[in-house]
Amino acid sequence: NLEYFEAEGEAAFYGPKIDFMAEDAMGREHQLATIQLDFVQPERFGLTYVNEKGEKERPVMIHHATLGSIERFMSVFIEHTAGWFPFWCAPEQIRILTINDAVEDYVAKIEAILKDITLEAPLRHNDIRYRVDRRNESLGKKIREATKMKIPCILIVGPKDVEAETVSVRLHESEDTVKLADLAEYIKNLK
């Protein structure tokens, strides 16, 4: 159930409309989606159609903006998520952090798994967007930077992971250890 109200006198001059409003973090309302009936434009453009009786009639035009202004939608979305996009729409979904060069062959196995993943609809045919951070920096610095970039999934790979055939996973609000054999299924289930 959606909360709604009638705003008499606020409708556009060309006919009634429905606005879908979203509230930002400061309590301000923003119009996002809208749908409206337009009785004016068809007349201005001289639009007609022939009805089932063979008579000319004036159509009613329907305007709609599914998201409203894309800029307005994105600003409300970014603010609402505080920049922590859901996994499926994050520009960079995964950052792989290496502890040292000794894990390179193991990272190649992880990359092969990521390249093989087929995401479910609506994401089918989307490749996993990831990057490997091989820089000779401290792990703490790499984690801080990836977190600051709000990357939803951080995979940490060190010698202990290679030995145990696991991957250390950091999500926005949790940490986990995943067997390499289970990594593809784990990634597919991220939201």
Place the predicted regions along the sequence by residue.
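NTP/phosphate- and nucleic-acid-binding module
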Residues: 1-191
